[in-house]
Amino acid sequence: MNHPDAGEVTCTYDAAGNLLTKLTAELKKTISDKAAISYTYDYERLSEVLYPKNLFNRVTYTYGKPGAKYNRAGRLVLVEDASGGEAYYYGNQGEVVKTVRSVMVSQADVRTYVHTATYDSHNRVRTITYPDGEVVTYGYDAAGQVTSIRSTKQGKEEIIVAQVGYDKDGHTIYTRMGNGTESTYAYDRQRERLQGMLLTANGDSIMQTQYKYDPVDNILGLTNVITPKAPKKPKGPGGFGRTDGTGGPDAGKDKEEKPLGGAFSHTYAYDELNRLVKASGKAKGIGYAMDMSYGLMGEPLTKVQRTDSGSVAGSYALAYEYGDADHPTAPSQIGHERYTYDANGNPTLVEDDSLNTERRMAWDEENRLTALSDNGKTSRYTYNAAGERVVKSHGYLEGVYVNGAPQGL
């Protein structure tokens, strides 16, 4: 496989079609043409992935032996990777009922996170218990569609989603959230496209959006015709309308705050290849217009945006240059920023000559960002076998992510 920016990727397979090796352009350039990612199998089940450059990214897969407890026979029971490991436990229908995630933040700091789940007879998730003890419960209708979600933690129950309604085609037409806000949705019955949405709270309309499309489903327009009422700041000590005699001339009166959101309109235009070429709109009295142009290979050539606010950040004109013969469709310069790439097409250096700043990036064999140096301030990232970021470190701070959700520092 050969890509104009990512270079050549060479793969080998066994007689059963299983991937055995993968050699990328960057590995070939920086190590050798023998330095490929290798894959090992156990009866056609992937058992190991080895990396020639970042050896600690090694991934191993362990499967349950005959007679294994917790219905693990023949199923994946453990995955070990650079971030730690994850063990799986199964129910009678093969559903995952428990996972134990061990995250190696550092050599001296290993943290464990346990998730459990229960299912109904249709193998639908009924409850999920999170590492902090929160239990989330799902309700379904006769068609198996989610109708409610509630949370219980430390004996306190909170409603996340109170009600969901569907039409005969399975489209969501109504939702009522735990905070009382309600949304109704309208669809184009011929193309099943969303045409409008009305959001209300406490009987007041907050947002009413309408969508317009062209014959190939590109969005041509998006409008909101409602500006919500300004919320009132309550009376009381420390606020407007103080009762201690220090509230000034407005003491004892409610004072309105600025409303959130407001009416807006956006319109879009496309060329014959369905590429966005124009956009314009207005929100909170400020309008904008944007134009783009493209080259023969679909690469952006120019982007010009103008706003009524006069903001330098909001109005700009960018020209895209493509001066790197090894990456013909990757920009070598956008405005004041100059880009350098590795052989796989990942950006490794971004220099801004107007601000005299630079960002340096490092990537692993799977093209995952492993380090970012922003003017000398470095962040590092560790991933699991699925490619999800699990650990982010910045200076002395290290953050952990499980299933994409932050778990704190």
List PLM regions with ranges.
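Beta-turn initiation residues at beta-strand->coil junctions
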Residues: M1-A6, T21-K28, E48-L55, R75-Y88, ...
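A residue-level detector for well-ordered beta-strand positions
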Residues: C11, I37-Y39, Y61, Y88, ...
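Short, acidic, Ser/Thr-enriched surface-loop or helix-capping motifs
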Residues: H3, D14, Y41, N71, ...
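Beta-rich catalytic cores
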Residues: A35, N57, G84, Y113, ...
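Extracellular beta-rich repeat passengers
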Residues: Q210, P215, G221, K232-K235, ...
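Short secondary-structure transition motifs
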Residues: K34, S38-Y63, A68-K69, I206, ...
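Intrinsically disordered, low-complexity Ser/Thr- and acidic-rich flexible linkers and loops
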Residues: L27-K34, A68-N71, M104-V110, P228-G261, ...
